Amino acid sequence: MATILVDVVSAEASIFSGQAKFVALPGESGELGILPGHTPLITRIQPGAVRIEKEDGSEEFVFVAGGILEVQPKHVTVLADTAIRGGDLDEAKAQEAKRAAEELMQNQSSDLDLARAQSELAVAAAQLAAIARLRRKK
């Protein structure tokens, strides 16, 4: 079966690099599905789970807090603002981040504070959704 090279990187490290049969991730306009031979594409991605179906049929999950996706017919590159392997996600930390963002929204003193709080809340909610999705897979 045809495969595509997938690289998921953040400023801190390379999180995943390998061949895959399929990649799904959250785009600005909804979920994107990438197969080998996909038309070239560059787009922004939203916070959420990147699902990589590897050659052997197993799945790898990586949480991204947004970033850029570049697709070429034989190569997919995810340049993530922040990327965390699915197994390394910390539910307690995500719950605390969500609570802190909600509190910041209640106590915001400017439009900038509100925008930052909304962004932090979106990332925390996406992390919690990714954790829930991983639990369903197990």
Swiss-Prot record:
GO MF terms, alphabetically ordered: ATP binding; proton-transporting ATP synthase activity, rotational mechanism
Membrane topology: Peripheral membrane protein
Keywords: ATP synthesis, Cell inner membrane, Cell membrane, CF(1), Hydrogen ion transport, Ion transport, Membrane, Transport
GO cellular component: plasma membrane; proton-transporting ATP synthase complex
Coiled coil (residue ranges): none
InterPro entries tied to this protein: ATP_F1_dsu/esu_C_sf, ATP_synth_F1_dsu/esu, ATP_synth_F1_dsu/esu_N, ATP_synth_F1_esu_C, ATPsynth_dsu/esu_N
Protein's cellular compartments: Cell inner membrane
Superkingdom: Bacteria
Family to which this protein belongs: Belongs to the ATPase epsilon chain family.
Quaternary structure and partners: F-type ATPases have 2 components, CF(1) - the catalytic core - and CF(0) - the membrane proton channel. CF(1) has five subunits: alpha(3), beta(3), gamma(1), delta(1), epsilon(1). CF(0) has three main subunits: a, b and c.
Free-text function comment from the UniProt entry: Produces ATP from ADP in the presence of a proton gradient across the membrane.
Protein name as annotated: ATP synthase epsilon chain
Organism field: Cupriavidus necator (strain ATCC 17699 / DSM 428 / KCTC 22496 / NCIMB 10442 / H16 / Stanier 337) (Ralstonia eutropha)
Classification lineage: Bacteria, Pseudomonadati, Pseudomonadota, Betaproteobacteria, Burkholderiales
Gene designation per UniProt: atpC
